[in-house]
């Protein structure tokens, strides 16, 4: 009887789980029935002592479709998140520290230094301390940094900061909480800075009562104090073996600087030497083609020597502006570089990929669609004319995307991009670690692979017109301005 009851309970739980997943899938599908797509801007701006954080609306229908949140940020205090992040950097120079639980010490050194009183151990006195850093990376413009879920990290900008873009995927399999974006701060008092600016925020767009309630629930999990604030000073003091005054400072209740602070010249840490080699030399020294093939086969379930790559030994950064990373280059039109799990293995854990694109003035990227991922397009320089078409052939977006704006391109929606007179650069985040596109025009497009008679019959063209349409565009993905203005056929005569 007990076995029957257990079986019935297991079946009931399985049935309930199936219903819940089916309802969730239906809800997600309904959220992607977009009749109109808009260029999105941040709805919340949080000013800290040394930087600004801009947050997009996680409950916007377009982000719900793509299961994603974007926010910008500008030294970040130590924090960890319940979501994985992928961060392209657009500044000259910076440093990042990542603390990986269970991994060996990467950098360690001892240094004689005077310390006493509130900065030392309980009881005061002078002594030595040891600095331990798990992973420390020199970062430069164009680096993409991947941070696994729940990993404590900090970021220090030792140059002139322009912009940092952070992408969070709220539907990632490692997020076992709800869809609200949460960051757990280990230092500072982010709540104080957010509350002081609450009345100064610009009014968001009109929202339904349901979305307002959702945003209120989301706000309850955001911009709180650091995690030590919830513990009592007595237990903190015992845990760290310090006095209660130091423990209260860890709580940060009187710290009004926010979550991004200015450290001046006081941050002195051991750091790896700067790599003076050229990008080509770095690429050649990194890994041989055979080693790359072996690593990829091992990750994809092929033959292996039994020693798999662990999170401790993985690379956490790669430079997407490196010319050797470019997948498509047209000197007259621009370049596109893609980062997927083959080039950047940690992306397989994050289930994300990144695209960096640049178009010269008036150049065009071939109309295309993304086969297996949603696409979040963020313009970092210039302006980009973007047109998006849904499955019914309706234009759901036809507008100029300016610097700092983002647009969501759902899976399989066709899109075409053209730069303005000054050119444009962008970064795209895709919700698949090996996102693939299919082109509609160009030498390697679906159109070029179709039989000539199919062109003539389906579009009611003469044979000459079909040949011109199929063979006149000899570029692959990026088209120079002469082609984008319809002069390609005339120029070939």
UniProtKB/Swiss-Prot annotation:
Pfam families: Cupin_1. PROSITE patterns: 11S_SEED_STORAGE (PS00305). Residues 191-221, 280-298 have a biased composition (Low complexity). Disulfide bonds join 32-65, 103-312. Residues 37-248, 318-467 form the Cupin type-1 domain. Keywords: Disulfide bond, Seed storage protein, Signal, Storage protein. The keyword Cytoplasm does not apply. Residues 1-20 form the signal peptide. Gene3D superfamilies: Jelly Rolls. Residues 190-229, 269-305 are annotated as: Disordered. The keyword Cell division does not apply. One of its GO terms (molecular function) is nutrient reservoir activity. Belongs to the 11S seed storage protein (globulins) family. This is a seed storage protein. Hexamer; each subunit is composed of an acidic and a basic chain derived from a single precursor and linked by a disulfide bond. This is 11S globulin seed storage protein G3.
